[in-house]
Amino acid sequence: MNYITTPLEDHVANMYYKIGISEPDSSIEEIARRLGIVLLYRKKPSFSMEGVITLNPFTSKEVRKITFAHELYHTLYHVGTQIDMPHLFRQLQEWQATNFAYHFCVPTFMLQKLKLPAYRSEAITFIAETFCVTNQFAKERLTIYEKQIIGTLFHERLSSSKELPG
């Protein structure tokens, strides 16, 4: 099977390659530094604005990484404040940032290098520990990855069909 990457997966891989990171062991501080993002820790809800990401230091390192990736998307790709935006547009931006976080925290190009355990529960724990994310986040990311594999297999099967049923 030739895994078909999505544009987001390609974009995340290119981001990491441009900053010289190819393994999952880099800290968010190092990633922020290489991206030119200022990272601050304050005892308040996390947010981002104009190249600065503020994280709550009292959350777990796994939650901070997930939040960092979510806020990174807002910093890089969204402008202005969400306060005056229509509700549906704000929801769209939040969905985009969350989807990006799944791929940024557990990049496909790094995930593909791993030999995942045969049992799904063990694979989830392995992903969570390898990429420093929560088990729930790893479970959802694995589901996203599996759906892309299924889509690739479906595409290959359709492409190999001699004729379409009529």
Which residues fall in each region the model found?
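Active-site hotspot residues in diverse enzymes, especially metal/ion-binding acidic/histidine motifs
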Residues: 1-166
